[in-house]
Amino acid sequence: KINFWINNARTIALPQSILPALFAISLGAMPAGFSWWMAIVALLGIICAHLGFNLADDYFDYKVGSADKREALNGEGFRARMHKYPYITSGQATVAELRNAVIVFLAIAVVCGLVILYFRGWPIALIMAIGGVLGVSYSGGPLKLGYHGYGELVIGIMFGVLLMIGMQYAVCGVFDWNVVLLSVAVGMLVTNIVYTHSVLDIIADEKADKMTFARVLGSKKNQLGALA
């Protein structure tokens, strides 16, 4: 059933993690400590973590009834992107199976991280821990950062700074401040994708009591200014 879960884990969003990872690999290809096999292990871990967190987002959204709220809003004439887990509501999979799929993807990511940790040392553990907490807390746990106006910031940190400095350290065993600076720019680009969705869904998010950066900004003028 692996293909089923890969297909439902929003693989269309994978460029958001793969492209920054490849960019970091290209930036780290010159140092003497560069390792291609470490790059492959790290890339596999990043992909599995991304898919796992996408499915975790589905799991937590299902728990709070996100689909029901959006369907009700569409019925009232408001624009609301429909739910992300038709495979659950249609009976193709159960919530328990979804939870297990999340565990499998994230477990593979952790194994990849432990391999890199063994060869590169404790900084990788710190990056993994921060990424794990942010990934789960985006829509789950007590924080639910994506529901309180911090979703765009979380995405920018995870897919920009953490991903790129983690990948570079994995392939080279060193940190480069040039990569750190570039990772901030990449994070802002990825953040723009999420922010654009929040601008389009601002009315639906307001009705569903979901706070996003677009809602924090308020006026259309401020929203467009931030997008620029």
How should each PLM-predicted stretch be described?
Residues K84-V174:
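Intramembrane alpha-helical segments
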Residues L22, A32-A56, A125-V133, D176-T196:
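Membrane-embedded alpha-helical segments that form the functional core of polytopic membrane enzymes
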Residues P15-A24, L153-Q168, R215-S219:
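Small-residue-rich segments of transmembrane alpha-helices in multi-pass membrane proteins
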Residues L153-I202, E206-A208:
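Functional transmembrane core segments of multi-pass inner-membrane proteins
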Residues A29-F34, Y59-K63, W122, G140-H148, ...:
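Membrane-interface elements of multi-pass transporters and channels
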Residues A56-I103, V190-A228:
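Solvent-exposed interhelical
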Residues K1-V41, G45, F53, L143:
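Topogenic membrane-insertion module of multi-pass membrane proteins
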